[in-house]
UniProtKB/Swiss-Prot annotation:
Pfam families, per database record: PCRF, RF-1
Modified residues (N5-methylglutamine): Q233
Keyword Calcium set for record: no
Compartment(s) of residence: Cytoplasm
Keyword set, alphabetical order: Cytoplasm, Methylation, Protein biosynthesis
Entry's Gene Ontology cellular component terms: cytoplasm
GO molecular function, one term: translation release factor activity, codon specific
Post-translational modification (record): Methylated by PrmC. Methylation increases the termination efficiency of RF1.
The protein, known as: Peptide chain release factor 1
Primary role: Peptide chain release factor 1 directs the termination of translation in response to the peptide chain termination codons UAG and UAA.
Chief location category: cytoplasm
Family (UniProt): Belongs to the prokaryotic/mitochondrial release factor family.
SMART domains found in the cross-reference section: PCRF (SM00937)
Length: 358
């Protein structure tokens, strides 16, 4: 581990030199790439340097114990050694996490797709609740949201809503939201007070740049039509809505949120690119996933990952056994406690895999 950390520190110092090189400064691509690489390494290097400093302080403190000291001073040194040893241990654990392989998509923007599943209109209302929850969370992080496509229902819910979240690190925090979300509550239309169970599915996809997913224009069929509102009525007499069909994969994306056909096509292309990337990624992992499922059970998107229980004001994430009695706050966008727990769980699993492999 420490050989790797030395190599990381050397690379970081080399990047500092490169970023002062006039040839690099005058080359926007190199400047951008080297700056990003340096930023990615910075936390690891600073943590490693703190670790080395603590080690030096620890050695000096232990050396002091070899000298003749007054009893009071000796106790102070022993106390300092205890604190330094605790700090050293914490830094080692942090460095182990920092050296874990990074998800290359973590810093990307996100395309989120929420769809009402079992439960009819109640499921559509819940899809709307989830949409508001994620947009409020995005606001708390300083991220921007933009609706790409929406199919609203008459009571204020959504059969489907697709939206973009623009912000640094958005995918790293929201990628754990993939799956089926379940709600338990008494619908407003329920006169008998019975609790109903409904579900909505969430897909979180990293936004892909054109260079990352090559799409041949001849493989895309473009259809245009007039935009429609709830119930199917036409709300736009111009042919501004766009439907893109990727012929090789059969993936279809529709966008009618903008009044401009060009803007609708641009938005649809972003979603199409992300879905194609996701499909190829799933196919590439299929063989590995099959082996893993046989060993530890399934973990695909169709499984229930979280339950939102209104009568008990409770949220339970079934993957990590986390229960929070703050449903009202969670739906208002306070997702940090859940997301941080999921990130820690993911890191723990990766550390376990790394230890098994070593």
């Amino acid at each position: 581990m420490f050989d790797r950390l030395e190599a990381v520190e050397q690379r970081y110092e080399k990047l500092n030199e490169l970023l002062m090189d006039p040839d690099v400064i005058n080359d926007p691509k190199k400047l951008r790439d080297y700056s990003k690489e340096q930023a990615d390494l910075e936390e690891t290097v600073q943590t490693y340097r703190e670790y080395k400093s603590v080690r030096e302080q620890l050695a000096e403190a232990k050396a002091m114990l070899e000298e003749k000291l007054e009893p009071e001073l000796r106790e102070m040194v022993k106390e300092e050694i205890g604190e330094l040893e605790e700090r050293e241990e914490a830094l080692v654990e942090k460095l182990k996490v920092l050296l874990l392989p990074k998800d290359p998509n973590d810093e990307k923007n996100v395309i989120m797709e929420i769809r009402a599943a079992a439960g009819g209109e109640e499921a559509a209302l819940f899809a709307g609740d989830l949409y508001r929850m994620y947009t409020r969370y995005a606001e708390s992080q300083g991220w921007k949201t933009e609706v790409i496509e929406a199919s609203p229902t008459g009571l204020g819910g959504y059969k489907e809503i697709i939206f973009m979240i623009n912000g640094k690190g958005a995918y790293s925090k929201l990628k754990f939201e993939n799956g089926a979300h379940r709600v338990q509550r008494v619908p407003e239309t329920e006169s008998g007070g019975r609790i109903h169970t409904s579900t909505a599915t969430v897909a979180c996809l990293p936004e892909m740049e054109e260079i990352e997913v090559e799409i041949n224009e001849k493989d895309i069929r473009v259809d245009t039509f007039a935009s429609s509102g709830p119930g199917g009525q036409s709300v736009n007499t111009t042919m501004s809505a766009v439907r893109l069909t990727h012929i090789p994969t059969g993936i279809v994306v529709t966008c009618q949120d903008e009044k401009s056909q060009i803007k609708n096509k641009e938005k649809a292309m972003k979603v199409l690119r992300a879905r194609i990337y996701d499909k190829y990624q799933q196919e590439a992992r299929a063989e590995y996933d099959q082996t893993r499922k046989q060993a530890v059970g399934t973990g695909d998107r169709s499984e229930r990952i979280r339950t939102y229980n209104f009568p008990q004001n409770r949220v339970t994430d079934h993957r990590i056994g986390l229960t929070i009695q703050k449903l009202d706050q969670v739906l208002d966008g306070h997702l940090d406690e859940i997301i941080e727990a999921l990130i820690l769980d993911d890191q723990a699993k990766k550390l376990e895999q790394a230890n098994d492999a070593s």
